[in-house]
Amino acid sequence: MGGGQKGLESAIVCLLVLGLVLEQVQVEGVDCGANPFKVACFNSCLLGPSTVFQCADFCACRLPAGLASVRSSDEPNAIEYCSLGCRSSVCDNMINTADNSTEEMKLYVKRCGVACDSFCKGDTLLASLDD
């Protein structure tokens, strides 16, 4: 198995892990109650460029205390530490387990970092492997 194939597999695993984490935030994190219109509003809002925070406010859904506290005055620090933790646990694992000398692998690691930044800022979109 070549280094490029191994890098691609690592990138896919990275995106799958981030997708699972994002799914947990969406399912367990935001409470729109039993109102199907609020749920539909929130889910359709997430399809656009809006953040979880913006969609929750717009659709009158409640964020849990832990997620809502990210919007406090320490938000830049919280985002920075979240991104740093994500990169060190997910993206660095890609570097350590694959041949990171290829240009393709460097691109995957960079996109993993972008995905971590998007996740930590509350965005629900992950970096695409297709540009």
Swiss-Prot record:
Chief location bin: secreted
Classification via InterPro entries: Thionin (IPR001010)
Post-translational modification: Is disulfide-linked.
Prosequence residues removed at maturation: 67-131
Cellular compartments per GO CC: extracellular region
Signal sequence, start to end: 1-29
Biological process, per Gene Ontology: defense response
Tagged with keyword Glycosyltransferase: no
Subcellular localization, as worded in the UniProt entry: Secreted
Tissue-wise expression: Developing endosperm.
Key word Transferase present: no
GO molecular function: toxin activity
Key words of the record: Disulfide bond, Plant defense, Secreted, Signal, Toxin
Similarity-based family: Belongs to the plant thionin (TC 1.C.44) family.
Function of the protein: Thionins are small plant proteins which are toxic to animal cells. They seem to exert their toxic effect at the level of the cell membrane. Their precise function is not known.
Name by which UniProt lists this protein: Type-5 thionin
Organism: Triticum aestivum (Wheat)
Underlying gene: TTHV
